[in-house]
Amino acid sequence: MPETKLQIICRDLDDCKEVDSTIKHILVPYDDSPYSNRAFVYALDLAKKYGAHITVLSIMYAHELPTHIQHQTVIDNEKRKVMEKSFKRLSDAAKKFEVIINTKMLMESEIVDNILSFVSSNNVNLIVMGTRGRGGPVRLMFGSVAMATSQKAPCPVMLVK
């Protein structure tokens, strides 16, 4: 177990003090995009510095497809295999720096709601996420996952370009 790290907190700039770090559990919403990979690197650095652990949460968008499309299960299985390989790569990096990491994969249609639900039920102290993901133009029409998460989250959110 890493030694307890200190963090500076301030009521205002004239009233600052060092206390035990409140960063214990960092969530990285992850889609294997370059943005989420960079977010993971920031989370890894913070976890190492503060003695926190990381949960990497991948919520693969469950498309509502017509029932006549037979190959959705095959597509979902391929997505799952790709994400499992990514999780292995992230776990290896965390192990190298002695950071505890957990991975979780969900197949859902409500991405932001599932991120927020996970945060609330798992004592997450910080979310580190990319400013963009793999969503493309369709996701832009419905709003940014990063923006919605940062506006609704009960904890600090770090957005990484």
Task: Describe each model-derived feature in a short phrase.
Residues M1-K17, S21, D92-I127:
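Structural beta-alpha unit
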Residues H71-I75, S120-N122, V145-A146:
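Short, hinge-like loop/turn segments at secondary-structure boundaries
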Residues T55-L57, N102-L106, M158:
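General small-molecule cofactor/ligand-binding pocket signal
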Residues L126-K152:
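Glycine-rich, Arg-bearing micro-motifs that act as flexible, cationic patches
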Residues P2-C16, S58-K85:
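Acidic, proline/glycine-rich short linear motifs
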Residues C16-Q70, K95:
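Small/aliphatic-rich secondary-structure junction motif
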Residues I59, G130-R132, K161:
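Short secondary-structure boundary segments
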Residues M1-N37, K152-K161:
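Intrinsically disordered or low-complexity boundary/linker segments at protein termini
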